[in-house]
């Protein structure tokens, strides 16, 4: 086993009318989506930050600035693919553990699909991907149903 490196990612986006809600690379049926320069996939953005952090390569904003029109409305899966290509020479993903915080929509019916999507995107078995859904019981930004936040812990393993 190679050396291990851990990273933590975080992201938050507010809800916006007229947009699709993308989480972990899949569309979740809901009356609002997430505002963002890209498609607003808060979970993939947190995952990207975790991967970059584990590899010591900064954060998502350094690689994909929201001032760059090239990333306007971009599919976050494309950004994740680019980050994986960036780290693949030296690292492989060992496992990821993610938390999505939202009052609504309830994510239990979609967690398995999100895990499958993330595993496929990361090129790992589904057993190496965990997704938890939490509420804040009416407290704060997410509790007031203003948006969604996500956290991701990523363990990278150094290639031999």
Curated annotation (Swiss-Prot):
User: Which residues take part in binding a divalent metal cation?
Assistant: 11, 13, 45
Q: Name one Pfam family in it.
A: YgbB
Catalytic activity annotated for this protein?
A: 4-CDP-2-C-methyl-D-erythritol 2-phosphate = 2-C-methyl-D-erythritol 2,4-cyclic diphosphate + CMP
The coenzyme or cofactor needed here is: a divalent metal cation
Task: Supply one GO molecular-function term.
Answer: 2-C-methyl-D-erythritol 2,4-cyclodiphosphate synthase activity
Which BP terms from GO are recorded?
isopentenyl diphosphate biosynthetic process, methylerythritol 4-phosphate pathway; terpenoid biosynthetic process
Presence of keyword Repeat: no
Metabolic or biological pathway:
Isoprenoid biosynthesis; isopentenyl diphosphate biosynthesis via DXP pathway; isopentenyl diphosphate from 1-deoxy-D-xylulose 5-phosphate: step 4/6
The EC number on file is 4.6.1.12
* Site-annotated residues for Transition state stabilizer: 37, 135
- Record's keyword terms, sorted: Isoprene biosynthesis, Lyase, Metal-binding
Q: How is the cofactor bound?
A: Binds 1 divalent metal cation per subunit.
Where, in this chain's numbering, is 4-CDP-2-C-methyl-D-erythritol 2-phosphate bound?
11-13, 37-38, 59-61, 64-68, 141, 144
Q: Carries keyword Mitochondrion?
A: no
Q: Which NCBIfam families match?
A: ispF
Main role? Answer: Involved in the biosynthesis of isopentenyl diphosphate (IPP) and dimethylallyl diphosphate (DMAPP), two major building blocks of isoprenoid compounds. Catalyzes the conversion of 4-diphosphocytidyl-2-C-methyl-D-erythritol 2-phosphate (CDP-ME2P) to 2-C-methyl-D-erythritol 2,4-cyclodiphosphate (ME-CPP) with a corresponding release of cytidine 5-monophosphate (CMP).
Q: Give the protein family.
A: Belongs to the IspF family.
Q: How does it assemble?
A: Homotrimer.
* The protein's name in its UniProt record: 2-C-methyl-D-erythritol 2,4-cyclodiphosphate synthase
Q: Which organism is it from?
A: Caldanaerobacter subterraneus subsp. tengcongensis (strain DSM 15242 / JCM 11007 / NBRC 100824 / MB4)
């Amino acid at each position: 086993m190679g050396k291990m490196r851990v990273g933590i990612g975080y992201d938050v986006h507010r809800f916006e009318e007229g947009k699709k809600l993308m989480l972990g690379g899949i569309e979740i049926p809901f009356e609002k989506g997430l505002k963002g320069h890209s498609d607003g996939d808060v979970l993939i953005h947190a995952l990207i930050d975790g991967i970059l952090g584990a590899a010591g390569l900064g954060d998502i904003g350094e690689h994909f600035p929201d001032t760059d029109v090239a990333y306007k409305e971009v599919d976050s899966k494309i950004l994740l693919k680019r980050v994986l290509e960036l780290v693949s020479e030296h690292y492989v993903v060992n496992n990821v553990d993610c938390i999505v915080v939202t009052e609504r929509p309830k994510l239990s019916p979609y967690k398995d699909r999100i895990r499958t999507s993330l595993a496929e995107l990361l090129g790992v078995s589904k057993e190496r991907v965990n997704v938890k859904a939490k509420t804040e019981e009416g407290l704060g930004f997410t509790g007031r149903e203003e948006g969604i936040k996500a956290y991701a812990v990523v363990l990278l393993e150094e290639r031999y």
